[in-house]
């Protein structure tokens, strides 16, 4: 990998606070691009618009989804934009390339009864269960990203309000309140688990060895809980984020408030995460439409 590409990835990690999974996607996109350059005998510095079009055609020839192609092109466009700030002689060959439209989809979320099933599955009488419950409670109660969760420190938790301060994308801080269930879960965790596992750090969530938990560790915890939960077949951290937003909207929260809680700069971004369930749509329809209910 070229040195400027390594500098680019370092910038994304340090300055933009990208998660390890996002960084891996950027890294893999650059590696694939470099392989294309080598195969076609092209140079990074002299790569042109016509070459960018050929690369786009190459990606589509691999039967990739439009969403994946869009991300890969976005990675390269962002990389060249960064390179231009370091070298005035560089031109971005992807700036005029027509961006493939992303496929639209409704984000998956858990129904309230499914969330209750998850909480019931978590063991409550051992250290691992106490820790696992805090992870799920925080992700569901606040809608934070896993990259934000694993970086929460003890000083970031306010048990009086209660709420938590997190460092989001672009190193932007925000405060998210949480409810009594989450507060009690954290309180028990701090009393019975965390102090005994604390090493030379002040991170809130730790693994069973007492070290700060990783994103991979959080995903392992979630998958383990799902395997033992009847009626729940799939989970990923962002699904809990979708669930957080969906449940708030279903209970009447306004979009601007949800935007602030999620840490989104643009309201349009929040729209991708927040949608109402079919049950909620029917409930609103039945209550609002004058001819929705027969005989009334």
UniProtKB/Swiss-Prot annotation:
Residues 105-286 form the Tyr recombinase domain. GO terms for molecular function: DNA binding; tyrosine-based site-specific recombinase activity. Pfam families: Phage_int_SAM_1 (PF02899), Phage_integrase (PF00589). It is found in: Cytoplasm. Keywords: Cell cycle, Cell division, Chromosome partition, Cytoplasm, DNA integration, DNA recombination, DNA-binding. The keyword Cell division applies. Signal peptide: none annotated. One of its GO terms (biological process) is DNA transposition. The active site is at 145, 169, 238, 241, 264, 273 (o-(3'-phospho-dna)-tyrosine intermediate). Residues 1-84 form the Core-binding (CB) domain. InterPro entries: CB, DNA_brk_join_enz, Integrase-like_cat_sf, Integrase_catalytic, Integrase_recombinase_N, Integrase_SAM-like_N, Recomb_XerC, Tyrosine_recombinase_XerC/XerD. GO terms for cellular component: cytoplasm. Its main location: cytoplasm. The keyword NADP does not apply. Belongs to the 'phage' integrase family. XerC subfamily. Forms a cyclic heterotetrameric complex composed of two molecules of XerC and two molecules of XerD. Site-specific tyrosine recombinase, which acts by catalyzing the cutting and rejoining of the recombining DNA molecules. The XerC-XerD complex is essential to convert dimers of the bacterial chromosome into monomers to permit their segregation at cell division. It also contributes to the segregational stability of plasmids. This is Tyrosine recombinase XerC. It comes from Staphylococcus epidermidis (strain ATCC 35984 / DSM 28319 / BCRC 17069 / CCUG 31568 / BM 3577 / RP62A).
């Amino acid at each position: 990998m070229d040195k400027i590409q390594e500098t680019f990835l370092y910038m994304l990690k340090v300055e933009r606070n990208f998660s390890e999974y996002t960084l891996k996607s950027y890294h893999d996109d650059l590696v694939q691009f470099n392989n294309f350059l080598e195969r076609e005998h092209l140079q990074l510095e002299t790569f042109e618009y016509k070459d960018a079009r050929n690369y786009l055609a190459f990606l589509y020839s691999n039967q990739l989804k439009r969403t994946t192609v869009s991300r890969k092109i976005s990675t390269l466009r962002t990389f060249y934009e960064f390179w231009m700030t370091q070298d005035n002689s560089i031109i971005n060959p992807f700036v005029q390339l027509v961006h493939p439209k992303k496929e639209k989809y409704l984000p998956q979320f858990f129904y309230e009864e499914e969330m209750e099933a998850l909480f019931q599955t978590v063991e409550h009488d051992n250290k691992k269960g106490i820790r696992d419950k805090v992870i799920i409670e925080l992700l569901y109660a606040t809608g934070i990203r896993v990259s934000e969760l694993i970086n929460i420190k003890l000083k970031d938790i306010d048990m009086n309000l209660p709420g938590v301060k997190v460092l989001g994308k672009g190193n932007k801080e925000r405060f998210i309140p949480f409810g009594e269930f989450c507060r009690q879960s954290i309180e028990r965790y701090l009393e019975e688990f965390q102090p005994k596992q604390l090493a030379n750090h002040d991170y809130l969530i730790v693994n069973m060895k007492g070290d700060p938990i990783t994103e991979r560790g959080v995903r392992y915890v979630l998958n383990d809980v799902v395997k033992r939960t009847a009626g729940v077949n799939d989970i990923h951290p962002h699904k809990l984020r979708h669930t957080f937003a969906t449940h708030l909207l279903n209970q009447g929260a306004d979009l601007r408030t949800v935007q602030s809680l999620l840490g989104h700069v643009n309201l349009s971004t929040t729209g991708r995460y927040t949608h109402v369930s079919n049950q909620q749509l029917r409930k609103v329809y039945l209550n609002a439409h004058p001819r929705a209910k027969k005989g009334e």
